[in-house]
């Protein structure tokens, strides 16, 4: 069997996804005590893993460095990479939301300023609504931007809402549901069809039982 390389998102999503691969019989023990390592081999299969930042997973898959990737739907919507989206894994579930301070009135007729890590998604969303907004991209914690008067509102991922609450913000509108997706390199799906679909079919069986 040909080797298959899988790119995983480091951090929170990684913890949700590794158990799925273990359930289909892959040995992921190397990743349990990984230290600073970013590449791993499954000892009982033809699969190897790499751990990268969320924004890089789809890039590695698009360019064929990884055959399969696991990444949030938010990243796929923002960067629109040329890959196949195969499965909604139904883990890492959260929502992309518009949030601001309680006193903010979104119905005020003026151009709004929105801070976000997702300028492309945000631009398309407000364009579809016919609203003219100024978008300011912020890479760090966007929650502080409305408090300092930089923007009127933010667009960000909300899981429990605790971070918003701790910073005095509320959800104004839920935009999109977000969850982890399995993506595949287009060329790899042809060259390693049997190996990749073997993984996909097993994962689908696990997900369908949830």
Swiss-Prot record:
One Gene Ontology MF term: ATP phosphoribosyltransferase activity
EC category name: transferase
Entry-linked Pfam families: HisG
Enzyme Commission number(s) from the entry: 2.4.2.17
GO CC annotations, alphabetized: cytoplasm
One GO term of the biological process aspect: L-histidine biosynthetic process
Predominant cellular place of this UniProt entry's protein: cytoplasm
Gene3D superfamilies per record: Periplasmic binding protein-like II
Keywords linked to the UniProt accession: Amino-acid biosynthesis, ATP-binding, Cytoplasm, Glycosyltransferase, Histidine biosynthesis, Nucleotide-binding, Transferase
Compartment(s) where it occurs, according to its Swiss-Prot or TrEMBL record: Cytoplasm
Substrates-to-products reaction catalysed: 1-(5-phospho-beta-D-ribosyl)-ATP + diphosphate = 5-phospho-alpha-D-ribose 1-diphosphate + ATP
Pathway annotation from the record: Amino-acid biosynthesis; L-histidine biosynthesis; L-histidine from 5-phospho-alpha-D-ribose 1-diphosphate: step 1/9
Known role: Catalyzes the condensation of ATP and 5-phosphoribose 1-diphosphate to form N'-(5'-phosphoribosyl)-ATP (PR-ATP). Has a crucial role in the pathway because the rate of histidine biosynthesis seems to be controlled primarily by regulation of HisG enzymatic activity.
Domain notes: Lacks the C-terminal regulatory region which is replaced by HisZ.
Family designation: Belongs to the ATP phosphoribosyltransferase family. Short subfamily.
Subunit structure: Heteromultimer composed of HisG and HisZ subunits.
Official protein name in the record: ATP phosphoribosyltransferase
Taxonomic source organism: Bacillus cytotoxicus (strain DSM 22905 / CIP 110041 / 391-98 / NVH 391-98)
Gene giving rise to this polypeptide: hisG
